[in-house]
Regions:
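Surface-exposed patches in mature extracellular/periplasmic domains of secreted proteins
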Residues: 15-16, 92-95, 204-210
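Active-site metal-binding loops of divalent metal-dependent hydrolases
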Residues: 25-26
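Bilobed periplasmic-binding protein-like "clamshell/Venus-flytrap" ligand-binding domains
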Residues: 114-117, 196-212
């Protein structure tokens, strides 16, 4: 990273170059000492917990991004395409569904800027597993993989299985997803259920595909 930044500076283009450093997913804990660490986050890659999805993102653009600014609003790598297109003035294809949003207000530290995503959905190959809106994240009952016997030195280990009941987490105070608040906030569950229904009608599941479902990975 340092060498890249040095090269930008040496060529006199660092002030007006957007530099993005991020990851596509959390640590693959099955690989043990080569798998990384999720720190205070729950689980890792392959799950719908924060350890699988929440990743660091560092952006540098001296001409546009305020030095030392921090953003805690929800955004993801899918937002890079529409954001970069907007920056360079390129129109997005009209015949494709683009899931990402333009997050320039968040990048530029604009006062009062909020996440453009009303909801963020968590899917598995079988269908919808959870939904997040703002500070609240709801997960439906499902089974998930955990490292039963982590590997070592680049070799993967063995998976075990765990299950979770209907769960509600307040990520503003419990980023580790340790306190299930589902029974305490039925009104929040109801709100998130209404958002989940939108995704069900749009994407559907493996057994009942929605009008905008598409093959995994596409």
């Amino acid at each position: 990273v340092g060498k890249i930044l040095d090269a930008l500076k040496e060529n006199g283009i660092d002030d007006n170059t957007l530099f993005v450093f991020t990851s596509d997913n959390g640590p693959w804990l099955l690989y043990g000492n080569h798998g990384g660490s999720a720190g205070a986050l729950r689980e890792g890659k392959g799950t719908r917990f924060e350890g699988g999805f929440r990743v660091p993102c560092v952006m540098r653009w001296p001409a546009k991004i305020p030095d030392g600014s921090v953003c805690s609003e929800l955004a993801g790598s899918m937002d890079l395409l529409p954001t970069l297109a907007a920056i360079v003035g390129t129109r997005l294809p009209q015949k494709r569904i683009i899931d990402g949003k333009d997050i320039r207000p968040l990048m530029y530290g604009e006062s009062g800027a909020r996440s453009p995503h009303a909801a963020f959905y968590y899917f598995s190959p079988d269908g919808l597993v959870g939904v997040r809106s703002g500070r609240w994240k709801m997960l439906y009952p499902h089974n998930y993989n955990v490292p039963l016997q982590p590997g070592m030195d680049g070799m993967h280990g063995k998976y075990g299985r765990k299950s979770i009941d209907l769960a509600l987490f307040d990520l503003s105070t419990d980023v580790g997803e340790t306190k299930n608040l589902a029974s305490q906030y039925p009104e929040v569950i109801e709100q998130l259920e209404s958002l989940a229904e939108i995704a069900r009608k749009d994407i559907g599941s493996r057994s009942e595909p929605g009008p905008n479902s598409r093959p995994i990975g596409r």
